[in-house]
Amino acid sequence: DITYLKQDEWHRTSTVLVDLNDQGERSFTFMVRPSADLFLETTDLPCWRHGEWLHLCSIALSAEPSRTSAFTAMTAIRHAGGFVSFDPNIREDLWQDEHLLRLCLRQALQLADVVKLSEEEWRLISGKTQNDRDICALAKDYEIAMLLVTKGAEGVVVCYRGQVHHFAGMSVNC
């Protein structure tokens, strides 16, 4: 369904090059700045319906007008009885102001039903090393229904309804 696809002759979709080092750590090179998605306006947003989902990441929060549009969308879908999934997917080189990044992350966490954090994002947001009690405390503080912290090859830790669940990573052969 491409009902809400908008074409813009002046802005292009970003191309991102991903490099993996020997330890499996990724680095990113963004080839188009600013990318078309950062020009999303509130007038581009649909009318949300009960039960619908919105998924977004912090890249949408890194610049205006997409920042205002993203927060407007998150609020609107919640009011309509829908749900918000948030994966910060932090790319620090897209943020010039760490204080603004933290403010935006806090606001997004308050509006999200499901949040997926990497271990690095967990440390940035919580200021702590990861343990089960702290994961559920963060979920409770922000009223997040399901909080997932991915641990690379070790799998994922999930806090859902105050209970912690551990799921092992799976080996994938390409």
Spans of model-derived segments:
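Structural recognition of alpha->loop->beta junctions
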Residues: 99-124
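Hydrophobic beta-strand scaffold residues
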Residues: 2, 84-85
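Conserved N-terminal subdomain of the carbohydrate kinase-like
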Residues: 1-57
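Active-site beta-loop-alpha junctions enriched in small/polar residues
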Residues: 33, 59, 89-93, 120, ...
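Structural alpha-helical scaffold elements that stabilize or flank donor/cofactor-binding regions
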Residues: 46-47, 107-108, 138-140
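Conserved phosphate-binding/catalytic region of the ribokinase-like
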Residues: 75-76, 127-174
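Residue-level signal for inorganic ion chemistry
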Residues: 54, 87, 115-118
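Charged helix-capping and loop-helix junction motifs
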Residues: 67-74, 98-106, 129-136
